[in-house]
């Protein structure tokens, strides 16, 4: 039996005669899905009483229901019983690593939610393992039962060696090499350093040139309307960071595709309701907008897939037909693949979703193979998910720590000012707050007086003399113990917050033991832990298993008192988002792109 991957369906050029024969009823199709209401993403209409003819994993034609029975006896039929049939969803911007599972494991959740194609920016593993990590992810993707394409990481590291230590450094030449070696490398990933881009930074523009010379589009990441014109002029033609109506409107008029990012509601990333107002209030066309998920942990990936984002677009004022087109055809069109995916026209891949009137997927066909039926994976998909890619040994040895690390600063002996990191919901922007403190007898007294706790970043790539940076979080809410993660964006050094050194040491030891993890510690015991042995970012388990671990983590995280979710905590070292961050080099004042002392 052919392995269930993207490559199981032959290229269109090799199938045109066969498809024409089937569409003309000279040859029987392999499968007919009949009795359906077909959602056309081309005309944005739903056609009643239709059937889809499939051969060789591609759509031959959409016909009136009952046509196949008249032409042939014995053809395989699947009765849709009046349900809606639509093309599989296409997610134009995601990071697989955020789900904490491999590409193969990710496929299970995607297909359960009707997503059959994704465009992945693997800059997380690139920040840890350089080109070797990106290529390992590509090999994983090739063997997954899902169509996965790469937008080559463009900003590794996120800033500079002066401000942080990363495990990878993707130079313009390395990026060009990835484009040249991998046909799946279809675009340049999000160019997060938008300020250097708009200021004409030489390295940033050399990276842009590596893509543009090869005819690859460039994905973006920008905040602030004042940057839009120069950013678009630099060749960036999509972004998922349109966080409100007005910047979304500016971007569309500048010729930039807008990917409306949907939630989930438990995180700070639900910008769709605001950005979509450029369409619903200002009258902009939806033809150059798509919907995306961006980041999902394993738990949220199962609960809030791209189908959920489509339904959110409907709640915000789009018609179901428009919203599904934004979730399928538009993403395909942005990357020039509308001739293969995103619709049910003749010759397209037979990636189909059967759903109810609320646009909730019930069944999924991937390349003409039924992989999800009535909300459950089929034996065919279960077999494919068991044939997972084995990551190289080096991926299981990326947490390199000194034998002993002091995790807390000395208590100030006299009055001073703290450059504190103030956390607040939604948790993306961190506020630089100068806190004047008076001497205290010990840290607990000082913490209680000013609403502070420790935060420390430890370099884990073995590229420094054991860099450790100390900071203080304000209003983080941690009542006891410690929380820690090896997923400290984007360089993925270890970040640990705590109320005391012993519990912080237990947390660091747990991460070292598992070669990566996110954990909660209290009273010297690990209360919750998600092991991440692959690059300190990914589990080697099925997505459903990891989702259960994440549920326990979230429960313990909340009980510890943390005011922002753990995915927001992971962003505390991300030195490209205002106002203040902490990396292994120290406190970073983002607007100035310079380091600051903890105490003044």
Curated annotation (Swiss-Prot):
It comes from the Bacteria. One of its GO terms (molecular function) is adenine deaminase activity. Its cofactor is Mn(2+). Pfam families: Adenine_deam_C, Amidohydro_1. It catalyses: adenine + H2O + H(+) = hypoxanthine + NH4(+). GO terms for biological process: adenine catabolic process. Keywords: Hydrolase, Manganese. Its EC number is 3.5.4.2. Belongs to the metallo-dependent hydrolases superfamily. Adenine deaminase family. This is Adenine deaminase 1. It comes from Bradyrhizobium diazoefficiens (strain JCM 10833 / BCRC 13528 / IAM 13628 / NBRC 14792 / USDA 110).
């Amino acid at each position: 039996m052919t392995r269930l991957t993207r490559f199981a369906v032959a290229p269109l050029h090799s199938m045109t005669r066969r498809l024409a024969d089937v569409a003309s009823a000279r040859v029987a199709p392999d499968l007919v899905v009949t009795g359906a209401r077909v959602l056309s993403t081309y005309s944005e209409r739903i056609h009643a009483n239709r059937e889809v003819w499939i051969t060789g994993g591609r759509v031959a034609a959409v016909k009136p229901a009952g046509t196949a029975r008249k032409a042939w006896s014995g053809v395989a039929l699947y009765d849709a019983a009046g349900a809606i049939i639509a093309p599989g969803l296409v997610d134009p911007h995601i990071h697989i690593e955020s789900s904490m599972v491999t590409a193969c494991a990710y496929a299970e959740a995607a297909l359960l939610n009707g997503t059959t194609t994704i465009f992945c920016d693997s800059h997380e593993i690139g920040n840890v393992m350089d080109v070797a990590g990106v290529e390992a992810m590509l090999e994983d993707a090739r063997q997954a039962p899902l169509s996965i394409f790469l937008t080559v990481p463009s900003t590794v590291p996120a800033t500079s060696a002066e401000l942080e230590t990363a495990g990878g450094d993707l130079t313009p030449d390395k990026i060009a090499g990835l484009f040249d070696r991998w046909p799946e490398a279809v675009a340049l990933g999000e160019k997060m350093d938008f300020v250097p881009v708009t200021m004409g930074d030489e390295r940033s523009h050399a990276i842009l040139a590596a893509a543009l010379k090869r005819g690859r589009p460039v994905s973006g990441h920008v905040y602030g309307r004042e940057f839009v014109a120069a950013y678009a002029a630099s060749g960036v033609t999509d972004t998922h960071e349109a966080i409100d109506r007005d910047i979304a409107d500016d971007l569309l008029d500048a010729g930039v595709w807008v990917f409306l990012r949907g939630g989930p509601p438990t995180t700070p990333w639900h910008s769709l309701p605001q950005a979509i107002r450029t369409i619903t209030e200002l009258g902009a066309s939806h033809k150059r907008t798509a919907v995306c998920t961006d980041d999902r942990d394993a738990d949220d990936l199962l609960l809030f897939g791209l189908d959920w984002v489509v339904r959110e677009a409907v709640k915000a004022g789009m018609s179901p037909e428009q919203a599904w087109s934004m979730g399928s055809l538009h993403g395909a069109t942005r990357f020039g693949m509308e001739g293969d995916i995103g619709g049910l026209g003749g010759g397209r891949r037979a990636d189909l979703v059967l759903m109810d009137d609320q646009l909730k997927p019930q069944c999924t066909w991937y390349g003409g193979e039924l992989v999800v039926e009535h909300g459950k994976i089929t034996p065919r998909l279960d077999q494919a998910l068991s044939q997972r890619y084995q990551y190289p040994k080096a991926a299981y040895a990326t947490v390199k720590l000194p034998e002993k690390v002091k995790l807390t600063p000395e208590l100030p002996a006299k009055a001073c000012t703290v450059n504190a990191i103030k956390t607040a919901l939604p948790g993306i922007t961190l506020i630089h707050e100068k806190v004047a403190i008076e001497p205290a007898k010990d840290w607990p007294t000082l913490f209680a007086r000013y609403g502070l706790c420790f935060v420390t970043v430890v370099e884990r790539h073995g590229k420094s003399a054991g860099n450790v940076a100390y900071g203080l979080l304000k209003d983080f809410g941690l009542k006891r113990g410690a929380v820690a993660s090896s997923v400290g964006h984007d360089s993925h050094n270890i970040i640990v917050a705590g109320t005391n050194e012993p519990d912080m040491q237990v947390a660091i030891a747990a991460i070292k033991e598992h070669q990566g993890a996110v954990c909660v510690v209290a009273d010297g015991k690990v209360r919750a832990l998600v092991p991440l042995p692959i690059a300190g970012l990914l589990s080697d388990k099925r997505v459903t298993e990891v989702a259960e671990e994440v549920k326990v983590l979230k429960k313990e995280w909340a009980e510890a008192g943390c005011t922002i979710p753990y995915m927001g905590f992971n962003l505390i070292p991300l030195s490209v988002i205002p106002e203040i961050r902490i990396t292994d080099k120290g406190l970073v004042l983002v607007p100035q792109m310079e380091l600051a002392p903890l105490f003044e």
